[in-house]
Amino acid sequence: MKADLVSGLLPIREDGCMLLLQRPTGTWEPPAGRLQPGESFEEGAVRELYEETGVLVSPQRIIATWVGEAASGRPLASVTYAGRTDRAEVRLSEEHLDHRWVTLGEWMSLPSWWSPENIKRIAGPVETVRIVGAVREPPLPSLREDTGVVTANLGAGAVLVDLGGVEPRALLLRRRKPPVGLWENPGGMLEEGEDFEACARRELFEETGVRARIEDAWWARVEPWRKPEDPELYAGVGFLARHQGGEIDPEATAHDAAQWVTETEWHTLRTWYTRRESDVLWKAIKEMEP
């Protein structure tokens, strides 16, 4: 499944109020827009926020993902971040009618593409960013020529976490296919009608035989699909999932071994992830409620 990529960034003040912008249609949404070529989800979110409001905020946590259709009928895939700010002044772009700093409750009373259920779902992540997020301004985003939409093949996966021991453990599966021997978490490509969460849930069950609740997204990436010079792009989102019991039964055609590993053990194995990404993952795992 392919879709045009969108990224957003919700600024959060110390008092818990969030910045929403009123679009010409009258709805109130977090600052967001389409990615430009060469951007990551985070870079696109920072640029869009700055272009639309003049505010600089560092993305500190993914609070929502979405896959659906634009008003034009084109498929869209979006990742929304949150970040702390101490700025109150907003330089509104001509694309918008107004702006407001609102609470979650006030947001739910406004017309919005976000449903009340989806707004309620971000209450926990938003509160975490408000309490522990540091106010950090990123560098000024690079000026990029608007060369049209960025379309990518969509994928998702989940790191299955066991919180029942002395320290958290995560499940890794060893690949049978190239790169043979690499350790990875369950994941794959979206099928028609799926969003990122549904894909992660299905892939987790298909590759482990375990059904688990998909929790927070901890990672999102845009990169060349099959090789560095590939003109086609891949856009993936990684989630956490809580192991609630059941024996791991690896899909035999894809993996030849499975093991539960601690953070220390994870870093000794060859995975898809950089050290920085692994550190972000384990920070998110440690923040999961027992």
Where would I find each of the regions flagged by the language model?
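Unchanged
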Residues: 35-58, 66-117, 121, 190-213, ...
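Residue-level preference for beta-strand/loop junctions
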Residues: 3, 26, 75-77, 152, ...
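Short, solvent-exposed loop/turn segments that connect beta-strands within catalytic domains
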Residues: 15-17, 71-74, 163-169, 228-231
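Residue-level signal for short segments within beta-strands and strand-turn junctions
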Residues: 11-13, 22, 85, 160-162, ...
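Conserved beta-strand and immediately adjacent loop positions that scaffold enzyme active sites
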Residues: 8, 17, 98, 157, ...
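Charged phosphate-binding loop/patch that engages nucleotide di/tri-phosphates or the phosphate backbone
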Residues: 117-141, 276-290
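Conserved Nudix-box catalytic region and its N-terminal flanking loop in Nudix hydrolases
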Residues: 14-51, 166-206
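Acidic, metal-coordinating catalytic segment for phosphate/diphosphate chemistry
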Residues: 1-8, 130-159, 163-165
